[in-house]
Amino acid sequence: MNPSRCRIIAIGKVRKSWVQDGIELYRKRLPGLTIVELRDSNPEKEAESIRQTLRRDEWPVMLMEQGETLTSINFSERLRSLGSQRLAFVIGGADGLTAELKALAHWKLSLSPMTFPHELARLLLIEQLFRAQAILQGSPYHRA
């Protein structure tokens, strides 16, 4: 997994300092990973902002409650199987993603069957990206 081939596109700003601290901790451990914050608005405007931000060479990975749930090991294997494909992990705002955006997904992913605030989902995702890299590199970080 190459962090420079991944972007996180998220609606809204992280307002809680402890969440931001966690995100920054993992961002430093994943050099090259980009996080794009888009302004929160109504779902249609958010969808338009996301569509405009997605690059043609990226596969959108939409994070949603109804997406595929994977173990950390399965997640790392999936990332490895995608090789050099550029990925854009998309986290919607408080109202989630529109049906139109969900239809653009190359992969629909759920971090859990539970619902989390979108800023916490960002922290969980970036930690799982770091964990996936650690698993693929044989690092002792993942000890399941």
Curated annotation (Swiss-Prot):
It is found in: Cytoplasm. S-adenosyl-L-methionine binds at G92, L111, S112, P113, M114, T115, F116. One of its GO terms (cellular component) is cytoplasm. It comes from the Bacteria. One of its GO terms (molecular function) is rRNA (pseudouridine-N3-)-methyltransferase activity. Specifically methylates the pseudouridine at position 1915 (m3Psi1915) in 23S rRNA. Homodimer. This is Ribosomal RNA large subunit methyltransferase H. It comes from Synechococcus sp. (strain CC9311).
